């Protein structure tokens, strides 16, 4: 019965000896969740693309920030 429990628990098959005493070996239990991750080529930085054609947007945001700073400083 102990051999059957070890087989169900992921260890060696019935009647076989497991080096980890019924526990699955670390090498065979690795999964894609832990060590086999691939890089994603589709990652974008949340719409912030430095070096692309967003220079006008950055200039507008900068001008608004400077304008608000000057208005607050006058009061």
From Swiss-Prot:
Any GO CC annotation of this UniProt entry: virion membrane
Membrane topology: Single-pass membrane protein
Biased composition regions of type Polar residues, renumbered to the chain: 26-39
Keyword Manganese on entry: no
Chain positions covered by the region annotation Disordered: 19-47
Domain of life, source organism: Viruses
Cystine connections: none
Major subcellular location class: virion
Membrane spanning residue stretches: 55-72
Keywords: Capsid inner membrane protein, Membrane, Transmembrane, Transmembrane helix, Virion
Subcellular localization, as worded in the UniProt entry: Virion membrane
Protein name: Protein P8
Provenance organism: Pseudoalteromonas phage PM2
Gene: VIII
